[in-house]
């Protein structure tokens, strides 16, 4: 959630930055007007409460002295009614404010380029040159079906579209990738954690998936439980509503999980193969930091994911996302895109984001800063998406006869 006090004091800056995320100024004006009205009504409530307290003391003193308390009792009764009505006004405004604020995205960092969509993202680095093939490279789904690695037909029979069964060497390679990624991230100082794949609505609110993106989530019927869209959600919320000792910051964690997404806005996109699935696996990085640490930690997380790709011999590039392509909670995001020979282009395989204090404000994650409590910064990123890494290896390491070479760093994990 954005800082409403900063919105009040720096309104034009918020309007400018959120315009880049396609937020109309009318939304911010409504938010600020509601915030100011709530402050006004809270002051009225406090004044009424002060009167109630004062009159109650006066009544007690008058009763002890044997004076006539009838008139004062009537005043207290009327003031109590006014208090009740004012409480309802404040409660309604608080609900309205939360409804507006919880749907407003994070503002962008100053170095995020203004743009409309992915066409306006900026390439800031390329790592490894794409391989030159002496034959026409096949797509991963062609290779997978020929080798008996990927069973799309039976996956669809069991679960429907956008589900795949990995068999034999593909299943082993996928498991090898998970173990290698965990070991690689752990060696960079990220603590391995294992979390639930089902979380409640408060948890999803904390990281920004609810209420805005409920249509993309799988909900358990008649329960306040959802399947996680990414392990960023439970891992970040490990510290939900906690005050962390500043001495242990930054906290750096890595986590393997299955992820589940409706892909509600992806109809007709990537319908063949494993690029876009309802269920997929990912190894995630999450960091919780002091505000002054988060830019350095973002660089470290990007380097970790990039070095992991490089260790697998996979050509990729770093993309600084423009304002219009940024996620809801992100202030700044670096995407890593891996080269896919069959498509002759780069595709996203990791997205590393700094959310500043946006998620921390929603999830109430604080640290002890001297004598006062302050909000942490939270960061998250894939290191890496397992299925897309499998795809990239299949396509970049394919031989002319349709077999797949296994990257040397993975052989001991197979």
Curated annotation (Swiss-Prot):
- One GO CC term, this protein: cytoplasm
GO biological process per UniProt: selenocysteine biosynthetic process; seryl-tRNA aminoacylation
**EC numbers on record:** 6.1.1.11
Known catalytic reactions: tRNA(Ser) + L-serine + ATP = L-seryl-tRNA(Ser) + AMP + diphosphate + H(+); tRNA(Sec) + L-serine + ATP = L-seryl-tRNA(Sec) + AMP + diphosphate + H(+)
Q: Which residues bind ATP?
A: 261-263, 348-351
Q: Which UniProt keywords apply?
A: Aminoacyl-tRNA synthetase, ATP-binding, Cytoplasm, Ligase, Nucleotide-binding, Protein biosynthesis
Protein's pathway: Aminoacyl-tRNA biosynthesis; selenocysteinyl-tRNA(Sec) biosynthesis; L-seryl-tRNA(Sec) from L-serine and tRNA(Sec): step 1/1
Q: Which residues form the signal peptide?
A: none
Q: Which SUPFAM superfamilies match?
A: Class II aaRS and biotin synthetases, tRNA-binding arm
| Kinase among keywords | no
Q: Name one GO molecular function term.
A: serine-tRNA ligase activity
UniProt name for this protein: Serine--tRNA ligase
Name the species this protein comes from.
Campylobacter curvus (strain 525.92)
């Amino acid at each position: 959630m954005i800082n409403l006090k900063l919105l009040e004091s720096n309104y034009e800056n918020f309007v400018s930055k959120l315009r880049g995320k396609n937020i109309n100024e009318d939304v911010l004006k409504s938010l600020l007007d509601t915030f100011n009205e709530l402050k006004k009504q809270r002051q009225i409530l406090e004044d009424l409460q002060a009167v109630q307290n004062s009159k109650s003391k006066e009544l007690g003193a008058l009763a002890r002295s044997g004076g006539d308390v009838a008139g004062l009792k009537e005043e207290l009764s009327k003031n109590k009614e006014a208090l009740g009505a004012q409480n309802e006004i404040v409660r309604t405004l608080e609900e309205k404010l939360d409804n507006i604020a919880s749907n407003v995205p994070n503002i962008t960092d100053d170095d995020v380029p203004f743009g409309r969509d992915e066409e306006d993202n900026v390439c800031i680095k390329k790592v490894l040159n794409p391989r030159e093939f002496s034959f026409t490279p096949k797509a991963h789904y062609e290779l997978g079906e020929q080798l008996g690695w990927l069973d799309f037909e039976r996956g669809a029979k069991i679960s429907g579209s956008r589900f795949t069964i990995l068999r034999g060497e593909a299943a082993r390679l996928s498991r090898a990738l998970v173990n290698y990624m965990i070991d690689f991230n752990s060696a960079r100082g990220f603590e391995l954690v294992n979390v639930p794949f089902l979380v409640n609505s408060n948890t999803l609110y904390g990281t920004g998936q609810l209420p805005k993106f409920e249509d993309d989530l799988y909900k358990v019927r008649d329960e306040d439980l959802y399947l996680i869209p990414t392990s960023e959600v439970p891992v970040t919320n490990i510290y939900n509503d906690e005050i962390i000792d500043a001495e242990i910051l930054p906290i750096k964690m890595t986590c393997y999980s299955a992820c589940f997404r409706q892909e509600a806005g992806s109809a007709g996109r990537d319908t063949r193969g494993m690029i876009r699935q309802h269920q997929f696996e990912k190894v995630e990085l999450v960091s919780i930091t002091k505000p002054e640490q988060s830019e350095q930690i973002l660089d470290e997380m990007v380097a970790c994911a990039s070095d992991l790709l490089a260790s697998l011999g996979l050509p990729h590039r770093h993309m600084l996302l423009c304002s219009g392509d940024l996620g809801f909670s992100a202030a700044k995001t670096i995407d890593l895109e891996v080269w896919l020979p069959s498509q002759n282009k780069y595709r996203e395989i990791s997205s590393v984001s700094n959310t500043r204090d946006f998620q921390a404000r929603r999830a109430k994650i604080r640290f002890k800063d001297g004598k006062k409590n302050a909000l942490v910064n939270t960061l998250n990123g894939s290191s890496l998406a397992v299925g897309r890494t499998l795809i990239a290896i299949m396509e970049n390491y394919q031989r002319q006869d349709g077999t797949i070479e296994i990257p040397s760093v993975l052989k001991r994990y197979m």
